[in-house]
Structures are given as structure tokens and as C-alpha cells.
Amino acid sequence: MRIVPFGAAREVTGSAHLLLAGGRRVLLDCGMFQGKEEARNHAPFGFDPKEVDAVLLTHAHLDHVGRLPKLFREGYRGPVYATRATVLLMEIVLEDALKVMDEPFFGPEDVEEALGHLRPLEYGEWLRLGALSLAFGQAGHLPGSAFVVAQGEGRTLVYSGDLGNREKDVLPDPSLPPLADLVLAEGTYGDRPHRPYRETVREFLEILEKTLSQGGKVLIPTFAVERAQEILYVLYTHGHRLPRAPIYLDSPMAGRVLSLYPRLVRYFSEEVQAHFLQGKNPFRPAGLEVVEHTEASKALNRAPGPMVVLAGSGMLAGGRILHHLKHGLSDPRNALVFVGYQPQGGLGAEIIARPPAVRILGEEVPLRASVHTLGGFSGHAGQDELLDWLQGEPRVVLVHGEEEKLLALGKLLALRGQEVSLARFGEGVPV
């Protein structure tokens, strides 16, 4: 049994790992490269898609599923296994990707082909491919997110996918993996633990209360899948503590995900399930309006506060949030709240550095609004959670992280006696 990384090797995006065992070739994830690595989506995979026997997808984020249509474009015609929640979310995610790609590397016919080959596989169900057996475990990162267990040739491999932050309320905690000979593990936040979630929520509510009380707008850049809905859940469960104000979900894609959530109840935490069992939707706080059309979005810029606006893109790479920032950052009554990762060199990181003004959509905008960064909302496991999950002293190969963060985690694993290395693109690792 061997595992060969073809993405997310000493980087965060592009997850794709080829498992070779029992005469079978199984691809674990097929993710898009993003940010400065985007051009690599046009490059060959590094293996022949026509020779792959099956694909397993851990969750519906683009950096794990975004090259799947390209795989079909280049000749793959086999099954694609994912949990039912991932299957349903992928239709939204891949169709949206078609609209936002600057230089498309697949077309609508490839998306249709890929979606037609999806096969649901639930947690704990074993998939048999000859002498190879595979199953999903709960990863707690998105509804339906999973890690993969692969057994064959007398060896066991675990691939973490993306592991969730276990302090959060919306999703179940990640399950512990079985004993394994090798774990291919993510290390997105391998260099630090997260701030406690309860403290993060408390600070978030204080920002909202202050800003709304003075008639301001709270501008929240959000990811359309999971993070936007999580913030809505916080507003639902704590809204009674806040001044009354409209809440605008200014993201049609996030709105589609929101509409899907009642069909995914069993993938949420027991706390969330309890709300649904009482006939309530805890992702729809009082005063919520989903903004579908561009003209309605622009009208929010002219409307007075108080209000809460959630809009994409979460990393300010484009989208409606840029118009809200262009019109809102110059008003000292307003607040900009980052609840997700902001990459170095991006507009978000520039704003966090608090210059007197920033350039948005071709205009210099004075930065007078308050700016807040709340890292405790992260959807990834922090360093302490990763160390806990990797108990049992398996050999570990680290993926899905910037090199310095993987090195920091690797050092701690080595200090407790575990054999650890960092993945290299195209270099196979024996299990």
C-alpha cells in the first residue's frame, strides 16, 4: 500500500492523494488550487485519470472537490463516493465555481458528468474494492465532512481530510481515528491553538451590540458554505441580547446552502438537531433577509444602519462584500468583522494592518470603521486538537498547510516520539 500526494503538499490547496493498494488506484479528494497557485489547475494531474478505479471525497470545499470536473474532462468515468451531505452541497459548490473562474479549466458538461457519478457512502459503511476496504469517519468540519480509513494488504491508512474545531456548536466533534500504520494528516493550524470559542462568541456579541446601538453597520465577510450559516446560528441563539436590526445574507450561494440545511439535520450536532425537532430552524434568526439580486445588494449601501451584512467572498477576493467595504469603511460607526482566514498579501491582511486608507474597486477609501479579527471561528482544528487526534503514535505525513506551520506541528509530534515527515508532490510514501 502506497499513498502519493498530488496537491496540498507543503501548501493548503489542491488536495488530491492517490492510494495504490491491492491492485487498485483510489483518489482521495480532487481539489482545486487557489490563490497564487491557481494556474496549476490547468496543469496535468500527475497521473492518468483513466487509470483511477474510484474517487472518495472528504467534504464539499473547492480545495477538495474543485478539480473533479477536470478529472472527468480528462477521461475518468468511475464512481465518486461521498456522504449524502457532501453530494448535495457539491451541486451548489461546483455550479458556483463555473461562474467565478477567471480562466475556466472545465465546462458545465463536465460538472454534469461529475455529478452524475456521485454515490452516497455514509459514516461507518465499508466500501469493498477487491482486497481494499474503505470507510468514512466523522471529521466535524462541514456537514457531512469525513476522514478516510483504508485497509488492505494487512495495512491501515487514515487520511484526515479537514478536521473541525471541536469547541464549536453547530457540528459534531471529529471522531477519533482507528489505530493506523500511517496517518496522512492536515496541519492548517499546526503552529497554534485557537482562541476559546466561548470567548470569541462573547467578543463578537459585544462588537455587534456596540455597533448596532450607535446606528452602525456590521460588515462580515463570510464563506458561503458553513461559516455564513454558523454566524446566523450565533445570531439566532444570542439575538435576544442584541439591539433589533435587520440581518442581510448578501450571498445567493450562501442562501442556497441555507435552504439545503433542513435536509441535512442528521449531520449537525445534537444541540442543532434539538432545534429542528422542535420545529424551529436555528439558522434563520429574526430579521433575516437573503439578498438575491445585485440591485437589492447595492441598495443596502445607500440604506442607513443599524444592520448586519454577511457577504462573500470570505477572503475579499471579489464578490459583493467589496461594494459594502467601499461604501462602509469610511464611517466610524461601522465595524468590519473578520471571521475567517485572510491570506498574506490580500486585501484583508492590508485592512487588518490599519493603514489610513485602502484601495477598493479602484478607489481610495478612508479606513475609519473599527476592524476586528476573530480567529476562534475557524473551521479547522487548532494545534492542540491536531495533537490529540494523532494520539496512538502512528507514522504521520503532514499535508494541507503552509510549510512553517507543518514544521511546527511536526516538531511537536517528533518530540513525543512519532515518526513524521512533510509530503512532497508526486513522491509516494509506503504505508
From Swiss-Prot:
Inhibited by cadmium, cobalt, manganese, magnesium, calcium and nickel ions. It is found in: Cytoplasm. GO terms for biological process: rRNA processing. Keywords: Cytoplasm, Endonuclease, Hydrolase, Metal-binding, Nuclease, RNA-binding, rRNA processing, Zinc. Its cofactor is Zn(2+). Zn(2+) 2 binds at D63, H64, D162, H400. The keyword Zinc applies. CDD domains: TTHA0252-CPSF-like_MBL-fold (cd16295). The keyword Metal-binding applies. GO terms for cellular component: cytoplasm. One of its GO terms (molecular function) is metal ion binding. InterPro entries: Beta_Casp (IPR022712), MBL (IPR050698), Metallo-B-lactamas (IPR001279), RibonucZ/Hydroxyglut_hydro (IPR036866), RMMBL (IPR011108). Its main location: cytoplasm. Its EC number is 3.1.-.-. SMART domains: Beta-Casp (SM01027), Lactamase_B (SM00849). It is an enzyme of class 3 (hydrolase). Transmembrane segments: none annotated. Zn(2+) 1 binds at H59, H61, H141, D162. Binds 2 Zn(2+) ions. Has endoribonuclease activity towards 23S and 16S rRNA (in vitro). Belongs to the metallo-beta-lactamase superfamily. RNA-metabolizing metallo-beta-lactamase-like family. Monomer. This is Ribonuclease TTHA0252.
